[in-house]
């Protein structure tokens, strides 16, 4: 019988099925698998029952390795156990997977398959991770669509239990895991009928228990190990028939036909593609298109990849097939070919059938694969000598592996399908609104629906594109929309940056959010856009969603205005019903944030419908001619890579563009060329009110506001409007607070922290400040001035150039101000090892690199290894540098010792002696290095080769580097804690900066061991106290430790950073960082104020532990925080992560709130005792 139809994504489908068969799950967040664990956690908290009448027991672990170990233990104890992971997380589970398979335990690993980090990190889908564990002994089952995930995930669980073999159930990350489809949901009652209860009983009876004790995991010798390994063969031999049997039962239940290998296409096909994953849906769609035009082609979809059953493989391939292409979504450098291709060739080697077989790679790292690419593959198979070892979807103009793109103009989508594309900005709500819209269409109508959301890695402020399809036929199009019926754009600045209307069909609809009135459109819209609108009879509408949102008090969240306008224009369902459904979705999405938020969004829906304006398109637009613009002279990287990528044209870049940077090396300072212009309002300097305190620049997350010192001559030559005032503290300079409107995120923290009554900064609309762009560029062009202040003061630090600028961090980010400050103090000699996480994403999302250089070309050098090994990676960087500097010191010492025999220039000798005596000192190291390099004696010695004083390869190491290890609390408190502890214990001179947001910010806000009790994170509510990382580090006695909160005490922040860097040993700085995941009721524009509130309420304490004070006979612990004066519970109520607990779990909210306060008070009392001892 047909089941209930529901709109959901692949992750939800996998979670739904897995919940039914799971007693215990151990989890760890990693993109894109995290939503599976979140759903299971949410259902468990709601009391949802599995097939055994129990709620699932869920435990968040410190790493994926820990999660695999925990489910291994649960399985041995007789509990059915499941976990969810991807990419590097899956690799961390590998050792346990061998054990679980070897011990014949029925685990299921649900994997949203994702690229592995190689020359770069990539969070998007391919099969590198899944292929990497094919040798573990786990069975492997692959799905191609959301519906298949629902159906076949059940097969994985059922067969694992019956067959005693663990399963890796995998599907494409993002493309399937996050694609929303209307699917049929399996009923738990039907699944219960399929479950082999006797097999469950046997499994439980075989569990470890002291009532029937056995020993497992012995150490075996060569005499028996081999034999016992071979003894498990029978389980693998029996498994394919079991899988086929359960697939037959699912097929009978659903009417959808499943086999280990599913063939689709012409029964007498001559050409066939073999593949697995979402590409099979695209191939099926293309097969229908080609066969309808007289060709004879087909596709074999692989479901059960391990064990690979030859019997079932040959059963479904038409005997007419003569040419086969095998597609692998992975790359194995140095191998003869990729895995599935080798398996297929091996299969045919064992038969009498000898078709032509070629293989190719496709869609690595989430690359889109289109029907036109599939046609290229079929065209290749039709060639007299089909190309082998090909790639598709790229232009490989270096090793020439790529197939030429088919020039056919095709549309393979189902007839009657409507395609809509929505351009948005990360954090503007466009994606969330479209998720609501597609669920309304899918759940409230009889139409099929599909949604997919494409976005970059920026934390917010990046481009998002929502792709929605709906129609009366099933949708098999797992690729981005290239021909749209409707296009919406939520950002007016995009009209000059992107080809917004590319692919909009003639007669299609275009909705633009803009503040321009009808008269201004002719001036503001680019010529090419106007011409396209007129020439293609585009129905053009505008709405001032930003203005409406601000009037309603919604700030930059205008998503519901745009969404209601969409429903009005798209005419999918009656408008009154659409409004009703939208308001229901608002209640569901924002209900826990308070009725006021709900009411404002309801008004936004009504306003969006009422405010849409249809534009009468002038016919003259058809004949407009493009203006000739002289191109700017730009660095090759910017011109050839950054600009095309930022125009969303990176897919078309050829392989040759990356010649010379194959190892993943990117130049510094590229973010300065982006000029994103994403702010709604930007700060405007009120010259007469400013006291020149520089606090606004100090806390700016994006370095978009800076104090500039100007000479009289520079002031006289300045452009009009370049106001300045006499600089305080110096007699011969003028002062200006420069603002970059196009680099500002518009958070407003600068205005919030301004101490002047009436404020020296006011937030004004971005478009009103276009004149500031030229003034900013002039300010940056001025000659750098010597700092007239002490750089270790708040004011003085801001006269140092920030070497972290214009990152993709969220507006109001609490992390970047700390990192930026460190670069201002030590950036010219910094080496940074950065853990994967938020700070690695805002720190190095290609092509935007915010770490930059000074006028001498010096700046932070930055690298990322992995999430789990960052401390060790940073230590390794230090050890490598130390080894080279030791060689350098040996050379210098030898030169000085040989001075009587080989006389040195007196100046050089003095400089070398000074350098050798102070080589490990940070302050003054640049000056000492430059003195050595600048002496005439050094030049002469090098020229005459009289001594190996400083060999050229080592000269860069004269200056002592400042070694920093950056990471978030998920790294420092959890997955990387073991390594961090070891590095701190080593006594080596490294500086660790932990951005403590108290959640896993990068994966969506899950709890870490830094999360206090009562905080609602994605994995439900935290019930245990916050780990005191600082106290743990202090126990060594020789680690410098500080807790800081910039918004509470800027001077203490500066002092701690300066002391930590100067300390000749390990240092740990734990920095409180407000985050969008906290849900600040005062908004992220007040994130610095929130840090102050945290300290004033006693939620957070600022302190420093300085081991050198102990050596001087003083107390090494200094508590910098004052006695709390603010209400602790009021502070908690000001953040949604706490306040929502009352709405969700009122029965124990007060208890946990009190526990959180008691924990904080106890922690603070402990600090007080340390400070007074």
Swiss-Prot record:
Main function: Oxidoreductase required for the transfer of electrons from pyruvate to flavodoxin, which reduces nitrogenase.
InterPro entries: 4Fe4S_Fe-S-bd, 4Fe4S_Fe_S_CS, PFOR_II, Pyruvate:ferred/Flavod_OxRd, Pyrv-flavodox_OxR_EKR_sf, Pyrv-flavodox_OxRtase_EKR, Pyrv/ketoisovalerate_OxRed_cat, Pyrv_Fd/Flavodoxin_OxRdtase_N
The reaction(s) this protein catalyses: oxidized [flavodoxin] + pyruvate + CoA + 2 H(+) = reduced [flavodoxin] + acetyl-CoA + CO2
SMART domains the UniProt entry points to: EKR
Record's cofactor remark: Binds 3 [4Fe-4S] clusters per subunit.
Binding site for [4Fe-4S] cluster 1: 690, 693, 696, 754
One Pfam family cited in the UniProt record for this chain: POR_N
Binding-site list for [4Fe-4S] cluster 3: 810, 813, 838, 1075
EC identifiers of the protein: 1.2.7.-
The keyword Zinc appears for this protein: no
Annotated gene: nifJ
Organism, scientific name: Enterobacter agglomerans (Erwinia herbicola)
NCBIfam families, per database record: pyruv_ox_red
Residues annotated as domain 4Fe-4S ferredoxin-type: 681-710, 735-766
Region (Disordered): 922-946
Named cofactor requirement(s): [4Fe-4S] cluster
Bias kind Basic and acidic residues: ranges: 922-933
The family this protein is said to belong to: Belongs to the pyruvate:ferredoxin/flavodoxin oxidoreductase family.
Name of the molecule in the record: Pyruvate-flavodoxin oxidoreductase
CDD domains in UniProt: TPP_PFOR_PNO, TPP_PYR_PFOR_IOR-alpha_like
Main enzyme class: oxidoreductase
Keywords, sorted A to Z: 4Fe-4S, Electron transport, Iron, Iron-sulfur, Metal-binding, Nitrogen fixation, Oxidoreductase, Plasmid, Repeat, Transport
Domain of life from the UniProt record: Bacteria
GO annotation, biological process: electron transport chain; nitrogen fixation; response to oxidative stress; small molecule metabolic process
Key word Metal-binding present: yes
The organism's taxonomic lineage, starting at the top: Bacteria, Pseudomonadati, Pseudomonadota, Gammaproteobacteria, Enterobacterales
Ranges that cross the membrane: none
PANTHER family assigned: PYRUVATE-FLAVODOXIN OXIDOREDUCTASE-RELATED (PTHR32154:SF0)
Annotated positions binding [4Fe-4S] cluster 2: 700, 744, 747, 750
């Amino acid at each position: 019988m047909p089941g209930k139809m529901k709109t959901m994504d692949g992750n939800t489908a996998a979670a739904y099925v897995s919940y039914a068969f799971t007693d215990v799950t151990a989890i760890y967040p990693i993109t894109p698998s995290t939503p599976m664990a979140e759903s299971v956690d949410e259902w468990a908290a709601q009391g949802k029952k599995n097939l055994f009448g129990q709620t699932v027991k869920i435990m968040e672990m410190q790493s994926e390795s820990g999660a695999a170990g925990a489910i291994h233990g649960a399985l041995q104890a007789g509990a059915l156990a499941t976990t969810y992971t991807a990419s590097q997380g899956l690799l961390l589970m590998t050792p346990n997977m061998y054990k679980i398979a070897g011990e014949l335990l029925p685990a299921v690993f649900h994997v949203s398959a994702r690229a592995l980090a190689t020359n770069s990190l990539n969070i998007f889908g391919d099969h590198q991770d899944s292929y990497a564990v094919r040798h573990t002994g786990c069975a492997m089952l692959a799905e191609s669509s959301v519906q298949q995930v629902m159906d076949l995930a059940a097969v994985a669980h059922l067969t694992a239990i019956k067959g005693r073999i663990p399963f890796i159930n995998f599907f494409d990350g993002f493309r399937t895991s996050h694609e929303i489809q209307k699917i049929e949901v399996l009923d738990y009652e039907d699944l219960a009928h399929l479950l082999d209860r006797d097999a469950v009983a046997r499994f439980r009876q075989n569990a470890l228990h002291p009532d029937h004790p056995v020993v497992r995991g012995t150490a075996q010798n060569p005499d028996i190990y081999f034999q016992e390994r071979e003894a498990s063969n029978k389980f693998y031999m029996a498994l394919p028939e079991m899988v086929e049997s359960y697939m037959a039962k699912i097929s009978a239940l659903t009417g959808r036909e499943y086999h280990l290998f599913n063939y689709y296409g012409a029964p007498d096909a001559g050409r066939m593609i073999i593949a697995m994953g979402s590409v099979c849906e695209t191939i099926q769609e293309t097969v229908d298109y080609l066969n309808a035009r007289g060709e004879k082609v087909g596709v074999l979809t692989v479901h059960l990849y391990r064990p690979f059953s030859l019997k079932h493989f040959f059963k479904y391939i038409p005997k007419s097939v003569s040419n086969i292409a095998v597609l692998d979504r992975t790359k194995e450098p140095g191998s003869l070919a990729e895995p599935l291709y080798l398996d297929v060739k091996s299969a045919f080697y064992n038969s009498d059938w000898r078709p032509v077989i070629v293989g190719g790679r496709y869609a690595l790292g989430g690359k889109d694969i289109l029907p036109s690419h599939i046609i290229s593959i079929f065209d290749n198979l039709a060639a007299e000598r089909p190309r082998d070892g090909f790639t598709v979807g790229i232009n490989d103009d270096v090793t020439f592996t790529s197939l030429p793109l088919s020039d056919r103009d095709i549309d393979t989508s189902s007839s009657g399908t409507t395609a809509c594309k929505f351009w948005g900005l990360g954090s503007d709500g466009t994606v969330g609104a479209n998720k609501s819209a597609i669920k309304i269409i899918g759940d409230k109508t009889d139409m099929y629906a599909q949604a997919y959301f494409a976005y970059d890695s920026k934390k917010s402020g990046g481009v998002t594109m929502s792709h929605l399809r709906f129609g009366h036929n099933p949708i098999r199009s797992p690729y981005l929309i290239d021909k749209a019926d409707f296009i919406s754009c939520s950002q007016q600045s995009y009209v000059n940056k992107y080809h917004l209307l590319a692919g909009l069909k003639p007669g299609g609809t275009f909705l633009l959010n803009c503040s321009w009135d009808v008269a201004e459109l002719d001036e503001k819209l680019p010529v090419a856009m106007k011409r396209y609108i007129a020439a293609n009879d585009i129905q053009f509408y505008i709405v001032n969603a930003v203005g409406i949102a601000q009037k309603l008090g919604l700030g930059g969240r205008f998503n519901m205005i745009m969404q209601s306008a969409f429903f009005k224009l798209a005419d999918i369902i009656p408008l009154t019903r659409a409004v009703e459904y939208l308001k229901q979705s608002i209640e569901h999405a924002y209900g826990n944030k308070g009725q006021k938020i709900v009411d404002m969004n309801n008004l936004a829906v009504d306003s969006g419908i009422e405010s849409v304006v249809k534009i009468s398109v002038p016919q003259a637009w058809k004949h407009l001619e493009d203006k000739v613009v002289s191109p700017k002279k730009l660095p090759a990287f910017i011109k050839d890579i950054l600009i095309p990528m930022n125009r969303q044209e990176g897919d078309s870049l050829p392989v040759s563009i990356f010649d010379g940077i194959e190892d993943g090396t990117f130049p510094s300072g590229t973010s300065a060329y982006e000029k994103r212009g994403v702010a709604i309002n930007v700060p405007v300097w009120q010259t007469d009110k400013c006291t020149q305190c520089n606090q606004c620049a100090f806390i700016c997350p994006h370095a978009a506001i800076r104090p500039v010192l100007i000479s009289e001559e520079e002031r006289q030559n300045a452009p009009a409007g370049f106001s300045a005032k006499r600089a305080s503290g110096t007699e011969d300079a003028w002062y200006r607070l420069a603002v970059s409107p196009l680099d500002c995120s518009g958070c407003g923290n600068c205005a919030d922290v301004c101490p002047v009554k009436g404020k020296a900064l006011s937030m004004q609309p971005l478009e009103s400040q276009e004149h500031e762009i030229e003034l900013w560029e002039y300010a940056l062009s001025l000659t750098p001035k010597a700092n007239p202040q002490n750089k270790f003061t708040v004011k003085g630090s801001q006269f140092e150039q920030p070497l972290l600028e214009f990152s993709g961090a969220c507006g109001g980010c609490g992390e970047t101000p700390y990192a930026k400050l460190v670069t201002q103090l030590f950036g010219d000699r910094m080496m940074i090892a950065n853990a994967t996480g938020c700070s690695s994403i805002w720190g190095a999302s290609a092509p935007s690199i915010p770490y930059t250089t000074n006028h001498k070309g010096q700046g932070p050098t930055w690298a990322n290894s992995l999430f789990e090994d960052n401390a060790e990676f940073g230590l390794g960087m230090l050890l490598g540098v130390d080894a080279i500097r030791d060689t350098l010191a040996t050379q210098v010492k030898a030169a000085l010792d040989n001075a009587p025999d080989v006389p040195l220039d007196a100046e050089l000798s003095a400089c070398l002696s000074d350098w050798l005596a102070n080589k490990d000192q940070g302050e003054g190291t640049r000056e000492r290095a430059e003195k050595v390099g600048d002496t005439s004696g050094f030049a002469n010695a090098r020229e005459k080769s009289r001594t190996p004083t400083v060999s050229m390869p080592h000269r860069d190491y004269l200056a002592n580097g400042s070694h920093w290890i950056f990471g978030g609390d998920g790294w420092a408190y959890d997955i990387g804690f073991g390594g961090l502890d070891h590095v701190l214990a080593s006594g080596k001179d490294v500086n660790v900066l932990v951005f403590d947001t108290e959640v896993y910010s990068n994966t969506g806000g899950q709890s870490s061991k830094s999360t206090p009790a009562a905080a609602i994170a994605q994995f439900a509510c935290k019930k245990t106290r916050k780990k005191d990382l600082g106290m743990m580090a202090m126990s060594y006695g020789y680690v410098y430790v500080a807790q800081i909160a910039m918004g509470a005490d800027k001077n203490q922040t500066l002092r701690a950073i300066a002391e930590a860097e100067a300390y000749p040993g390990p240092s740990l700085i734990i920095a409180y960082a407000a985050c969008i995941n906290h849900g600040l009721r005062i908004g992220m524009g007040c994130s610095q104020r929130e840090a102050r509130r945290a300290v004033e309420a006693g939620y957070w304490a600022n302190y420093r532990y300085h081991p050198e004070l102990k050596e001087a006979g003083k107390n090494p612990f200094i508590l910098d925080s004052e006695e709390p004066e603010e209400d602790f519970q009021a502070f908690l109520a000001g953040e949604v992560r706490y306040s929502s607990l009352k709405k969700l779990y009122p029965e124990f909210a007060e208890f946990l709130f009190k526990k959180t306060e008691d924990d904080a008070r106890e922690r603070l009392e402990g600090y007080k005792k340390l400070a007074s001892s």
